[in-house]
Amino acid sequence: IELGAGNCEKARSLCLRLQPSEFVGIDISFDHLQEAMRGLEADLPWLHARALAADITQPIRLPDDLPQQRRLVFYPGSSIGNFEPAHAVQLLTQMRDMLGAPEDGGGLLIGIDLPKPVHVLQAAYDDAAGVTAAFNRNVLAHVNRLVGSDFVPDHWKHRAIFDSELSRIEMHLVALSNQHVRWPGGGREFLMGERIHTENSYKYSKEAFAAMLKQAGFSHLRSWTDEQGWFAVIHAWQ
């Protein structure tokens, strides 16, 4: 059961190794997900792949006929770090609930981005090529499409800040000049240097994340890290 499945490429590798009988990909975009399911079933003819359109931050009802035993919830990458800690624990609890009872033998396989030197984080979240900056400014273009505002993305500068106390990277957009932004029914003056806080990315130690898993009802875990200790994959079960 993959949350935020996208094109299912990570799940494809895992399915080749684990040989599951069923796969459920969950994502907000159903059409794209269905296409990925067809590709999975074409390449892995023994696999029954299903697409489920859902917002993973909301309660999810799995198919009624999905086998209860030995479910594996798969949440790769490190997206759990984009949620506030209390919300992350709620999501982990929801993942645990998908597994059924402890005797059903289910588990969670999840990735987390570990703490690392500040200069490494800064280079990743404020890269020289400007990829992250463009991604962050695109938030304003998206807001314009959604609500009809008139933000000019080029009038804002991307800034990434590491908060060592909270162990998180914060992404901000900083106004490059005084500007008035309008939207239907209102507007707002932004002064030069004023910031919009767009995103957080928490960097949990294995110990801190283990405590969160315990809060969510997981009793056992094992983990793997890369040689530098910058990323971890954790298998947790009840």
Question: Which residue stretches match the model-derived regions?
Answer:
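A short, conserved alpha-helix within the catalytic core of class I
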Residues: 82-97
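Conserved SAM/SAH-binding beta-strand->alpha-helix loop
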Residues: 29-31
